[in-house]
Structure formats: C-alpha cells, structure tokens
Amino acid sequence: MIIAVDFDGTIVENRYPEIGEERPFATETLKMLIKDRHRLVLWTCREGELLEAAINWCRERGVEFYAANRDYPEETTDNNPHFTRKLKADLFIDDRNIGGLPDWGTIYRMVSHGKKWRHLIDEAYSGSIDYGEPSSSSHSHRSHHHKSWWPF
C-alpha cells in the first residue's frame, strides 16, 4: 500500500518551521509499516532546506521514505509534464484528518488490520480489541485502485 504521511503535527509536534518533538511512537510505527512492505511517501508543505531537514530528521531515526512530495523519487516536471504535488496514495496520515490524528498504535492497527473507525469504536464498546495478525489484504500487493482518506 502507498501511504502518504505528513510531517509537522503528525510525525512531530507542530513547531513549523522548526522541528517539534516526536509524537509518541511515530517513528517506531513508521518503521513497522516499512517492515510490513508499505511504501511511505513524506507529504508535507516543507520545501528546500526545510524539507531536507525533515527527511534527515526521519533518516536519523531509521525512517527512509520512498519519496517526498511526489509519487516516486525520480518524478519531476522534466520527466512528467503533468507533475503535481497531489499524490496518488492509498492512504493519507495527517493531523488535519477529520476527527484529528489517532495515536500511532491505532494508526498501525487501522493500516495493518484493515480496520475502520466504526470497527475500532465497536471494539472499544464491546471490549474485544483485536491485536491479532495483520490482514494480508493490507500489504503492498493490495490493489491500488481504491484511494482514500481514513475510512469511517
């Protein structure tokens, strides 16, 4: 699965243009998603030196993004005349999501288990939270036809 991840307010507390403190478990969760063979794209308003600072901050903590602010690393206006920063991702993780940003443990469960908000709410009310094996349909070989924000 291709997952676009915002930086300020999502991976770190929002202190733009400075880099805020890491949000609890953000880099650990991102590394788990990479290990699960998801392709992560850094999706941020940062450009130039500020973007490089964010990429380096993540790299120093073991998080290597597939690309930053583009669909693939080599994409430019030279080789793609229709280049746009609007990404073609399967999922977006962003603090500006409707309902706000869940904690990173919840994010991992939603991605790896294919959970939707309504499932998590039902589990919370019933007390039967599923921490089982990740869903095989959520891995990188999943069809890339369905693009969405967090499903409700």
Predicted regions mapped to residue ranges:
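Alpha-helical substrate-recognition element adjacent to the catalytic core
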Residues: 1-77
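C-terminal cap/substrate-recognition subdomain and adjoining C-terminal extension
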Residues: 51-152
